[in-house]
C-alpha cells in the first residue's frame, strides 16, 4: 500500500487535470462512478509510538485529550499531505511514520469490505447475521445489541490482523417509508419514533462498546442523514433526488432516530446522504450538519461526518448546487462534511484554497475530528492489551461470542407467522407423518440469496433443501419458476414434485435481483408468475396435503390472494435469514421453534404503490396528490397485513396486571419541571409503566412479543395519526398450559408528545389511550392537563458556514 500511497500523493499536482467535461447523468444513473483508489481495501498497520518518528509527538501521549493529540499530529502535515488524506482512502504520511488508513468499512449485519484473503484461523469463517429488517422483527433489544457486539469483536480481531478498519459505515437507520424502496431490507422498518430509534441505540452501543466506554471498540456511523429512502424509482436517481420535506415531517419522522443516535447512543460518526432536501444537498447542508447535529442533537464534540461515497461530487453533479467541483468541495467542507468518501477533496482542494474559498483551518477541522476518533479507538496506543483491551482480540475471541447460534436465533426470532389454519407446526417424520416434503420455488434451495445485501462473508450457507434433508425428510425439490420470469416451462416438474410429497412448501417472493442498493421495485405485487404456480399447486393438492408458503425478501409483497385462498394453509414472512436461514425456516415449520416475530412494515395492497409518487415524502394523507397516508401511523386504507401483525402457535391472553392502574392524570407543568437526574432530558423520564399479565393457555411454550401504542383524537393539531408505537418488549419462553409472565414497558414522557407544523416536539393537553398490540388487549387511559409545553424546539433553518470547534 505504500506504493499506492505515494501514487496518490503524486496525483495532487495533476488535480485540475481530473476534470471531466462529459458528465454522467446522475439524475437517472443511480450508481456513482468512483475512482479506483476510493474502493481500495488496504492492509492496515499501526503507527509506532514507541520508537517511530511520531514517538515524541503529543499524539503518542496517552495522558493528553484525544482532540489535542489529533491536533498535534495534523499540525505536522504539509498542506499537500493534509489534502491527500481527506478522502476515505488515506495514504498516510510516510515521512511521519503514519500508515495508510481506510475509513470505509461495513458492518451492517456482518463484516463487509474486510480483507478476506486466506489467513488461517481468520479465514475459517466470519459470522453473518440475518438482514436488519428480519432481526428487528424479533422486537428484542438485547438481541440487536448482541449482534452488534459480536460484529465489533470480529471487526477488532480483523483490525488487529490488519484486515479491517476501526470505523464502520453502519447502521442504516433511515426509515422504510415507501414499500418499493430497494434498501429497506437494511433498516429496522417503517417506525422512526420508537423502533428505529431503539434499534439505533442498541446497534450503535453494541458496535462502540457501550454508551461512554472507557475504550471505544469501533466507531459506528449513523446513515444516511437525512431524508434518504429512494434509489431509482421511475428513473429518479438517489444521486440527484431533491425531495421536499416539511419541518413537521423532518422532526417527527425523518430525524428522531438520528437524534437518539447522537444524544443517547453517542455515535461517533454520521454519513450525509446523496439526496438534497428542500433544494440543498445533504452534504452541503449546514442546517443538517451543524444546526441539527451539533447544536441541537448534541453530536459528540469530535464526532466526524463522512459524505456518502461520491456525494460531495454530487453537490456539483447532478445537483448543480455548486458551479464546479472545487466549489462543491468547498461547500461540503464548510457545511461540516469532514471526510469525503470519494476523491473530490483530494483532487480539488488545491484550487479551492487558491481561490480563497477554503482555508487550511477548514480542512484541518474535519481531519482532526477523524483522528481524534482514531485516538479514542487506540490506534496510537501500541498493541499492548494493558493500554487497550481490544488490541489483543483474535479469532478465539470471536469464537467465544457464540456468534453462530446468535445468527440462528436472530432468524428464528424474526420470522413472522402471517396466516395459519392450524396446519402448522408440521408433524415430524419421526411421528409417522410428513415424511416427504416438496420444496418448490426460487428460494427453495437458496444459499447466497439468504444473505440480502451488505452481508458479511459467511462461513457456510444452509439452504432449505439442506436443512430438511438433514432432518430426515425425503425432499422433492423443484424450483418451478424464478423470481421474475413468466416462463411456465418448469411448472410441470414442480407440480409432479408436489404430487409425490406429503407436504408442499413454496419458498419465493423477492430477492436482491429486484430490491437492492440503486434498485427500487416498480411494483409491490409478487413478481413474475410465482402466484400462478402457487395457485396451480393449491388447485391440485388433496385436502389433507398441507400447502405452506414462505414469503421471502426484505420488502413486502401483496399476498392478499394467499391470505384469502383457503387451500393455502399457512403463510410466513422470512426476510433474509442469513447463514443458518434454512435451519431457521425449517425449525419454525416443524415446531422445533415457535414463531413470535411481528411485521415492522405494513403490507399494502399492490394498488398502493401505483396510487401516488414514491417521491412524495409527506406522511399525512392528501386528496389532492392522491396520497393515502404513509406508514401505519397515517395510512387511511386497509392493509393486507398491518404493521405489528404476527401470530403464534399457542394462545396468549393478556389482562391488566394485578393492582395496575388503568387511568392516569398528569399535570404537564409538574411533569416538565421535575428533576430528571437519570435522563438527559425531562422528556426521557418514565411517565408510567404499562403493565399486563400474559398467560399462555395453549399447548406450546412460546416467546411473546408486545407492542404498545398510543393514540389520541383530542391532543394537539389535527389530523391525528391512527396510532404510534411508544414501546415494545419480548418475553422469553412463556410456559404452555397456564404459564404466566409479567409485561412491564416503560412509557416515557416524550412518547406522548406530538410534533407541530413548525417542527417543535410538544406535550399537549388532552386524552390519550395506550394499548397493547393491534388487538388492543389492554388499554390504559391517560389525561394530560394544564398548558402545552415544548419539549424540543425545532431550530430555524438557515444555511451558512459551519462554526469552528
Curated annotation (Swiss-Prot):
EC number(s) reported in the record: 3.2.1.37
Glycosylation sites: 20, 115, 140, 235, 244, 350, 383, 405, 434, 445, 486, 490, 622, 653, 667, 689, 711
Catalytic residues (positions): 308
Gene Ontology molecular function: alpha-L-arabinofuranosidase activity; xylan 1,4-beta-xylosidase activity
A GO BP entry: xylan catabolic process
Residues that span the membrane, as ranges: none
Signal peptide boundaries: 1-17
SUPFAM superfamilies per record: (Trans)glycosidases, Beta-D-glucan exohydrolase, C-terminal domain
Catalytic activity: Hydrolysis of (1->4)-beta-D-xylans, to remove successive D-xylose residues from the non-reducing termini
Keywords: Carbohydrate metabolism, Glycoprotein, Glycosidase, Hydrolase, Polysaccharide degradation, Secreted, Signal, Xylan degradation
Pathway: Glycan degradation; xylan degradation
Superkingdom of the organism of origin: Eukaryota
UniProt function note: Xylan 1,4-beta-xylosidase involved in the hydrolysis of xylan, a major structural heterogeneous polysaccharide found in plant biomass representing the second most abundant polysaccharide in the biosphere, after cellulose.
Protein family per UniProt: Belongs to the glycosyl hydrolase 3 family.
Protein name, as recorded: Probable exo-1,4-beta-xylosidase xlnD
Organism: Aspergillus aculeatus
Lineage: Eukaryota, Fungi, Dikarya, Ascomycota, Pezizomycotina
Gene that specifies this protein: xlnD
Amino acid at each position: 500500500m505504500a506504493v499506492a500511497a505515494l501514487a496518490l500523493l503524486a496525483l495532487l499536482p495533476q488535480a485540475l487535470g481530473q476534470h471531466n467535461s462529459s458528465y454522467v447523468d446522475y439524475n437517472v444513473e443511480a450508481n456513482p462512478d468512483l475512482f479506483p483508489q476510493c474502493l481500495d481495501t488496504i492492509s492496515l498497520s499501526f503507527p509506532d509510538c514507541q520508537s517511530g518518528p511520531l514517538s515524541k509527538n503529543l499524539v503518542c501521549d496517552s495522558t493528553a485529550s484525544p482532540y489535542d493529540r489529533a491536533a498535534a499530529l495534523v499540525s505536522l502535515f504539509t498542506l499537500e499531505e493534509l489534502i491527500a488524506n481527506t478522502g476515505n482512502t488515506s495514504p498516510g504520511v510516510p515521512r511521519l511514520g503514519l500508515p495508510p488508513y481506510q475509513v470505509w468499512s461495513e458492518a451492517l449485519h456482518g463484516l463487509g469490505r474486510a480483507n478476506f484473503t486466506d489467513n488461517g484461523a481468520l479465514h475459517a469463517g466470519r459470522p453473518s447475521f440475518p438482514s436488519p429488517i428480519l432481526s428487528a422483527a424479533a422486537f428484542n433489544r438485547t438481541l440487536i445489541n448482541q449482534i452488534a457486539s459480536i460484529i465489533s469483536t470480529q471487526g477488532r480481531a480483523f483490525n488487529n490482523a490488519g484486515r479491517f478498519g476501526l470505523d464502520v459505515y453502519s447502521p442504516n437507520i433511515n426509515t422504510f417509508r415507501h414499500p418499493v424502496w430497494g434498501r429497506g431490507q437494511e433498516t429496522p422498518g417503517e417506525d422512526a419514533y420508537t423502533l428505529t430509534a431503539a434499534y439505533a441505540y442498541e446497534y450503535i452501543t453494541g458496535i462502540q462498546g457501550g454508551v461512554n466506554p472507557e475504550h471505544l471498540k469501533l466507531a459506528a456511523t449513523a446513515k444516511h442523514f437525512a431524508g434518504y429512502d429512494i434509489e431509482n424509482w421511475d428513473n429518479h436517481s438517489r444521486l440527484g433526488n431533491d425531495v421536499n420535506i416539511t419541518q413537521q415531517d423532518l422532526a417527527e419522522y425523518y430525524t428522531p432516530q438520528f437524534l437518539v443516535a447522537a444524544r443517547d447512543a453517542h455515535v461517533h460518526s454520521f454519513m450525509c446522504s446523496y439526496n438534497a432536501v428542500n433544494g440543498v444537498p445533504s452534504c452541503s447542508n449546514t442546517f443538517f450538519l451543524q444546526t441539527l447535529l451539533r447544536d441541537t442533537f448534541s453530536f459528540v464534540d469530535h464526532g466526524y461526518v463522512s459524505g456518502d461515497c461520491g456525494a460531495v461530487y454530487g453537490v456539483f453533479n447532478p445537483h448543480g448546487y455548486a458551479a464546479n467541483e472545487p466549489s462543491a468541495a468547498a461547500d461540503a467542507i464548510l457545511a461540516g462534511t469532514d471526510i469525503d468518501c470519494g476523491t473530490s477533496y483530494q483532487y480539488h482542494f488545491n484550487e479551492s484554497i487558491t481561490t480563497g474559498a477554503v482555508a487550511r483551518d477548514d480542512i484541518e477541522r474535519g481531519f482532526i475530528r477523524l483522528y481524534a476518533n482514531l485516538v479514542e479507538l487506540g490506534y496510537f496506543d501500541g498493541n499492548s492489551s494493558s493500554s487497550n483491551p481490544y488490541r489483543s482480540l483474535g479469532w478465539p475471541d470471536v469464537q467465544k461470542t457464540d456468534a453462530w447460534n446468535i445468527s440462528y436465533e436472530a432468524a428464528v426470532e424474526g420470522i413472522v407467522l402471517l396466516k395459519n389454519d392450524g396446519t402448522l407446526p408440521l408433524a415430524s417424520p419421526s411421528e409417522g407423518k410428513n415424511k416427504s416434503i416438496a420444496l418448490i420455488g426460487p428460494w427453495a434451495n437458496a444459499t447466497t440469496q439468504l444473505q440480502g445485501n451488505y452481508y458479511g462473508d459467511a462461513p457456510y450457507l444452509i439452504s432449505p433443501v439442506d436443512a430438511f434433508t438433514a432432518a430426515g425428510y425425503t425432499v422433492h425439490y423443484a424450483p418451478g419458476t424464478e423470481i421474475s420470469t413468466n416462463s411456465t416451462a418448469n411448472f410441470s416438474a414442480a407440480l409432479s414434485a408436489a404430487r409425490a410429497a406429503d407436504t408442499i412448501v413454496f419458498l419465493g417472493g423477492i430477492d436482491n435481483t429486484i430490491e437492492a442498493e440503486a434498485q427500487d421495485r416498480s411494483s409491490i405485487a409478487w413478481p413474475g408468475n410465482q402466484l400462478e404456480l402457487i395457485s396451480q399447486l393449491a388447485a391440485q393438492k388433496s385436502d389433507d396435503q398441507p400447502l405452506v408458503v414462505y414469503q421471502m425478501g426484505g420488502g413486502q409483497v401483496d399476498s392478499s390472494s394467499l391470505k384469502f385462498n383457503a387451500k393455502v394453509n399457512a403463510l410466513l414472512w422470512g426476510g433474509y435469514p442469513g447463514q443458518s436461514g434454512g435451519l431457521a425456516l425449517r425449525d419454525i415449520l416443524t415446531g422445533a421453534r415457535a414463531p413470535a416475530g411481528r411485521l415492522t412494515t405494513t403490507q399494502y395492497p399492490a394498488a398502493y404503490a401505483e396510487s401516488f409518487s414514491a417521491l412524495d415524502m409527506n406522511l399525512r394523507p392528501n386528496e389532492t396528490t392522491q396520497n393515502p397516508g404513509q406508514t401505519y401511523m397515517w395510512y387511511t386504507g386497509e392493509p393486507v397485513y398491518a404493521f405489528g401483525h404476527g401470530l403464534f402457535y399457542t394462545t396468549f391472553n393478556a389482562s391488566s396486571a394485578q393492582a395496575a392502574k388503568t387511568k392516569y392524570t398528569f399535570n404537564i407543568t409538574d411533569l416538565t419541571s421535575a428533576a430528571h437526574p437519570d435522563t438527559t432530558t425531562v422528556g426521557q423520564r418514565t411517565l408510567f409503566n404499562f403493565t399486563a399479565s400474559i398467560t399462555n393457555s395453549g399447548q406450546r411454550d412460546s416467546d411473546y412479543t408486545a407492542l404498545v401504542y398510543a393514540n389520541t383524537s383530542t391532543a394537539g393539531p389535527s389530523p391525528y395519526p391512527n396510532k404510534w408505537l411508544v414501546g415494545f418488549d419480548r418475553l422469553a419462553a412463556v410456559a404452555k398450559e397456564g404459564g404466566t409472565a409479567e409485561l412491564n414497558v416503560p412509557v416515557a414522557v416524550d412518547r406522548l408528545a406530538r410534533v407541530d407544523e413548525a417542527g417543535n416536539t410538544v406535550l399537549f393537553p388532552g386524552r390519550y389511550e395506550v394499548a397493547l398490540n393491534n388487538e388492543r388487549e389492554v388499554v390504559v387511559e391517560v389525561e394530560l392537563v394544564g398548558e402545552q409545553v415544548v419539549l424540543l424546539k425545532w431550530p430555524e433553518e438557515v444555511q451558512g458556514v459551519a462554526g469552528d470547534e
